[in-house]
Amino acid sequence: MLTTPSFTLGIEEEYLLVHPETGDLVGRAPESLLPAMRSKLGDQVTREFLQCQVEVGTRVCQTLAEAREELSYLRQTVAEVASEHDLAVIASSTHPFAEFDQQMITDKSRYASLEADLQHVARRLLISGMHVHVGVEDDDARIDLMSQVTYILPHLLALSTSSPFWRSGETGLMSYRICIWDEMPRTGLPSDFESWSEYLRHVQTLVDAGIVEDASKIWWDLRPSCRFPTLEMRISDLCTTLEDALCI
């Protein structure tokens, strides 16, 4: 029997680290920064692909009010710790004038592998986003809901946009981040599947062909999480305000 989904919420956000006086991105984050953040947030804060980024993630939230409290605390704490290191944090999906080829990639095997595989396409990823996990415990229900929700993904992107500038220029687009991201393989709207088993066969075909190691390398705008029984919405820009993030 199909069980009613819990529709729990989990929100992940990626922030940019800048010098408060100039707004310039940090070339290399201070070694003490992440330990200081983790002393207050534990594993809710992690490094990201570039040294100038940090990522936070809420705990599993049962209500929107709980998500508001969690995300507010994460944003405030990250900003406070950054300030203690003479840095500031900005919530924006692109930096208005930074050059991507001047940024330093975080020393981590997963990121080194990504750069080795995708070269210049990966190096251009000076972008930040917001990912929202929604709890849907039944496998087939997760796939069915993915097909239904795909229709509204462009609307969510339009409501979240925060990246009109790129390399000191006005792009003419409200979300230039999505243009950068769509240069990556296996992105865009998800494929349509009739069942969880059909989705698993699709993943296994990619694995057998040597295209991906596992489902975590499928970067659709909406996907079944490979870590949790959730649907992961990945299309939106990083919202500049807490209220906008919660609205999305």
Which sequence ranges carry the predicted segments?
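An acidic/histidine-cluster motif and surrounding catalytic segment
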Residues: 132
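Terminal catalytic/cofactor-binding subdomain
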Residues: 1-121, 126-127, 213
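Loop-rich catalytic cores of soluble enzymes, especially ATP-dependent carboxylate-amine ligases
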Residues: 107, 128, 136-243
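Catalytic cores of large soluble enzymes that bind and process phosphate-bearing ligands
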Residues: 66, 70, 191, 244
